[in-house]
Amino acid sequence: MGITRDSRHKRSATGAKRAQYRKKRKFELGRQPSNTRIGPKRIHEVRVRGGNKKFRALRLDSGNFSWGSEGVSKKTRIIQVAYHPSNNELVRTNTLTKSAIVQIDAAPFRVWYETHYGILMGSKGKKATSTPNPKSKHVQRKHSARLGDSKVDSALETQFAAGRLYAVVSSRPGQSGRCDGYILEGEELHFYLRRMAPKK
């Protein structure tokens, strides 16, 4: 029996079984879920209705994640699935789907922050000393002009210190073959932190 997306096989609102008056149709077909896991990239191309293509990601290990408040996107490694609003089984099996909360590598964003603002992350305005060559006056002026915008949420700063950031997957890995999303910040971050906190 193929997977179908029709509703004729469902009981009616009053609980009556519906009579079968036609067979399944091609335009009602469904396919098995991709259950995208974390691992070396493996993507299958699927030919779909109209001759179009879908990209079924079976394994992914990285994606493009954006840092909304800073307006920057970086390709970074996906470490693990931390929470899923619909199913704990998807967390246990590290399955990547849309709206999964994942932990990503913070390094690309930390490097960008420290070069953009010229200060160390979480150092309360301390200058970055990692570069041996002195900065030009022009670059110093740029950095000092940007310093006012360099405030980072304390919860986010804690994650940067640990080297892992919480992010939401906003693409559909089983449809587009990509695992892209955005870093959790502000109210949304605090909401999910409360959900992930161990129950008393």
Swiss-Prot record:
Question: Primary place of residence?
Answer: cytoplasm
User: One GO term of the cellular component aspect?
Assistant: cytosolic small ribosomal subunit
Q: Where are the transmembrane segments?
A: none
> Disordered: where is this region?
1-40, 123-145
Q: Does the keyword GTP-binding apply?
A: no
Q: Where in the cell is it found?
A: Cytoplasm
Task: Output compositional bias ranges, type Basic residues.
Answer: 135-145
* Coiled coil location: none
- Please provide the record's keywords in A-Z order: Cytoplasm, Ribonucleoprotein, Ribosomal protein
Q: Which GO terms describe its biological process?
A: cytoplasmic translational elongation; maturation of SSU-rRNA from tricistronic rRNA transcript (SSU-rRNA, 5.8S rRNA, LSU-rRNA)
Q: Name one GO molecular function term.
A: structural constituent of ribosome
Biological function: Component of the ribosome, a large ribonucleoprotein complex responsible for the synthesis of proteins in the cell. The small ribosomal subunit (SSU) binds messenger RNAs (mRNAs) and translates the encoded message by selecting cognate aminoacyl-transfer RNA (tRNA) molecules. The large subunit (LSU) contains the ribosomal catalytic site termed the peptidyl transferase center (PTC), which catalyzes the formation of peptide bonds, thereby polymerizing the amino acids delivered by tRNAs into a polypeptide chain.
What family is it from? Belongs to the eukaryotic ribosomal protein eS8 family.
The record, for NCBIfam families, names:
eS8
Please report the name of this protein according to its UniProt entry. Small ribosomal subunit protein eS8A
> Taxonomic lineage of this organism?
Eukaryota, Fungi, Dikarya, Ascomycota, Taphrinomycotina
This protein's gene is called rps801
